[in-house]
Amino acid sequence: MTGPVNPDDRRSFSSRTPVNENPDGVQYRRGFVTRHQVSGWRFVMRRIASGVALHDTRMLVDPLRTQSRAVLTGALILVTGLVGCFIFSLFRPGGVPGNNAILADRSTSALYVRVGEQLHPVLNLTSARLISGSPDNPTMVKTSEIDKFPRGNLLGIPGAPERMVQNAATDAEWTVCDAVGGANPGVTVIAGPLGADGERAAPLPPDHAVLVHSDAEPNPGDWLLWDGKRSPIDLADRAVTDALGLGGQALAPRPIAAGLFNAVPAAPALTAPVIPDAGAAPQFELSLPVPVGAVVVAYDADNTARYYAVLSDGLQPISPVLAAILRNTDSHGFAQPPRLGPDEVARTPMSRGLDTSAYPDNPVTLVEASAHPVTCAHWTKPSDAAESSLSVLSGAVLPLAEGLHTVDLVGAGAGGAANRVALTPGTGYFVQTVGAEPGSPTAGSMFWVSDTGVRYGIDTAEDDKVVAALGLSTSPLPVPWSVLSQFAAGPALSRGDALVAHDAVSTNPNSARMEASR
């Protein structure tokens, strides 16, 4: 047993923290280690390891450090490789079929579609999407994975489009051109905006027209294309030709293809209108004894002539051309149109019995076929417009936009198809037919127009999910049937047609051999 311990006899411990002799009283961090101390400690550790492993502490060489660096480099390469494999797998998956309905052989790119437990070869991606009911892209898998499934018959729609990428256009623009000469004779259909530089076909100038001849039934004969319409004309009717300013000319109508002829809306014939009660006295008073059917004239303050047709219930303003047609048909004995004062015209009732829009306002100038062999009908309907419009173009060459090229149709002329088409490569058009009238609603059948000039009907009567399965998300563009019929006819796109099984696919009767350079 020990006695009491004197506190002064206890062992004391001195702090390892240096005494702060800084006159400013700066506080030092406890346990602070410098970079040189760490470097020295590492050197001592390497020297101890060298002595244990190599029995040499002189450190003339340091093979252990080289080995550690090699191990670290190898580890970094391994990690980098693993990360690269992971990233590569995101872009090109390993090929597990999973629940995917559309598969593709990685080795041959052959397409397959799953129907139940069987895997069927399929003719094209469009057919596969129609069968699966979704616009999925094929999953690339190994051949060994393909061979694990029981095989079914060949399915699909022969001739269906391989890809369906929708054009981003929201304004509908369709053009049908007919060239009687030049580099591209025949009918050409152009989709999208036109080019307007140089000698490209442009809208007809005011008071210009194109004289054509059509052999198409049921109305063969001569026609005048003007102001976005076509009017039948009898070139032997001097009353009309003289009024139009065509008298005394050697008239030689150019031939017009059925495609362009049908694309231009028809107007009433250019003949003298029938006026009821012609020759009788009108039901209103005039200062001059003028019968019904006669033409009178009044002059403005600037001496501009204003022509009026005398009808039984009033006067109707008419154009100089219609006034000349009426006078050339029956002048009612007047060498010059009787003149009325402006005050008398203002007191006289007005009538609207004649269709004055069926006649040009002024005499026309015919476009020469030798200088301007290309004639076009340009149909357009902007997305924000309530009505469509059509204009007649004329020029020396096709109005193709810069960089746009034509594709010749194999079945040109078969079923009314054009000779060639011009569409932006890589994209097609989801369209819906519309009537020829400017205000017709877009409520017709739906089609897909490919960049190769083929139209495919989309059958929505059987299944309303067909449009979604094809990946067509935006609203269809309107197109008149007179233009759409110029594209080559392709098969209908429906799920029922896509599920048709084949042992073999027959050749297309409208096919043609293409000469390819070796």
Curated annotation (Swiss-Prot):
Enzyme category, top tier: hydrolase
InterPro entries: T7SS_EccB, T7SS_EccB_R1, T7SS_EccB_R3
Lineage: Bacteria, Bacillati, Actinomycetota, Actinomycetes, Mycobacteriales
Presence of the UniProt keyword Transmembrane in the record: yes
Keywords (A to Z) from UniProt: ATP-binding, Cell inner membrane, Cell membrane, Hydrolase, Membrane, Nucleotide-binding, Transmembrane, Transmembrane helix, Transport
Compartments (UniProt record): Cell inner membrane
Cellular component, GO annotation: extracellular region; plasma membrane
Alphabetized Pfam families for the sequence: T7SS_ESX1_EccB
Gene Ontology MF term list: ATP binding; hydrolase activity
Zinc-finger recorded as keyword: no
Organism of provenance: Mycolicibacterium smegmatis (strain ATCC 700084 / mc(2)155)
UniProt EC number: 3.6.-.-
Protein name per the record: ESX-3 secretion system ATPase EccB3
Membrane topology field: Single-pass membrane protein
